[in-house]
Amino acid sequence: MTIIRKCKQILHSNTVVTEMPMCKRMVIVVLISQLLTLNAYPKQDEISSFVVVSQRDSRYFELSNGSPYIPIGFNLVGPPREEEFDRLFKIMADNRINYCRVWVSHNDWNVEHEKCLQFDPDRAKTIDRFLSLARKNRVRVKMCLEYFRDIRSDRNRWSDNLIYHKANGGPYESMHDYLSSDEGRSHFKAKLDWYANRYGDNPVVFAWELWNEMDAVRVSEWLDWTKEMLPELHSRFPRNLAVQSLGSYDWENKRQRYKTLCLLKDNNVAQVHRYLDEGAGWEICHGPVDVLASQAVRELIAFNPGKPIILTETGAVKPRHMGCSELYAKDQDGILLHDMLFAPFFSGAAGTGHVWWWRQALDEPNLWYHFARFAEAVEGINPPAEHFEPIMISENRYRLYVLKGRKTVLAWCRDSQNDWKSEFVLGHPPEILDSLEIDLSSFLSGSHQTQARVFDPWKNRWQDKSIKSGRITLDVFKRSVVILVE
């Protein structure tokens, strides 16, 4: 058990409060409060450390100083206005968010917005300030370089690039021309040079991402282009991770392309996008969010990529990605978000799921606290040291997502009869579960493990529980709880 977790346990222990003399209680409270305060501020070597793939267990991240790092965050796309920066970073700090993803070529962040290879220093200052605030608030940033899907003379879709087209003074007739020609590839490398000169060797950067969902571009040259450009990223940003992404994994026939990308040597992270989408060709995308998120992670685990897996985009959409789902307006408690955060990590991913639609899913309903609840559940957990084995057990009343480690068993118990359909479509409130017995015997390392702690993320409350004959009985809860055995 970590010092900080133990301190919190003592502070909330009725035994300590009631049995100690008042003077001793006050001294202990002051000392523990000082410890907690010291822990709230990072050491300088942590701030200056880079995110790396752990050498102890390549399925997880750590910092270059050896500290474990679990990316807890979301997609900050479209990018916020500069006047929103201070408010958003305060929210992130208050809710223990340590990661976000941005598109650096989107809207007012796009430095190459008037002419090819002409970079706007004023717009670069917006990115500068964002990264400065990220550093101050201990947030690592994934920098996604491109997202456009076609080069056209006139705008047909939001994702079209106009300035690259010959009709508008650019050098290219088409997307094919840009991706396949020597001129087009040299153009992209020159853009990398500009970013490297300004932002190279920056520990705030979690990773550089070549392109958002590159297999969705108008032509299908993403693989050859990616194979050439990933090493270019590594040469310019040798201390940062380099990654690429594909479109939503919503159809079984995408399995081979996902496997191909996940196994590319120069692609440091096995990323997957997966949404609740009732128009998807894969039926699993129509069902409970914990199930569809977990299955996406397990699909990538089956590829045996030997690198961290992250559900880097997830959310709820109208059928066939025709917009943000109406479900968010009904989700006052954050059921969708909760499952998107917890299910991937407890299925073997290296971090939470990273939600899309941040304004609708997070900001407007003010559901940011769910990140803090996840952070509380995993506080003090060291995934690279534990070498977790993910296990999922499905029973009639619950699904148990277990991470079995060398010294720790961490499990997320999800009510299998509760999901977005039961609450938002059928109108059934979550049932209160009482005296639910869970068999943990197959996950425990010995008879000495007779105590557990249970965290209710809906109430933000820990409770001590006994394990008897390998079984734990859970008291009153709804939807889900986390079980910790150390």
Mark where each language-model region is.
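Bacterial N-terminal signal peptides
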Residues: 26-37
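Low-complexity, intrinsically disordered or signal/transmembrane-proximal segments
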Residues: 9-12, 34
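Active-site mouth of glycoside hydrolases
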Residues: 46-281, 286, 291-292
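Catalytic-core region of carbohydrate-active enzymes that cleave or remodel glycosidic bonds
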Residues: 238-240, 264-265, 269, 273-275, ...
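Acidic, Ala/Val/Gly-enriched low-complexity intrinsically disordered segments
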Residues: 16-19, 27
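Aromatic- and carboxylate-lined catalytic core of secreted/periplasmic carbohydrate-active enzymes
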Residues: 67, 305-310, 316-319, 333-464, ...
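Boundary at the C-terminal end of the N-terminal hydrophobic targeting segment
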Residues: 40-42
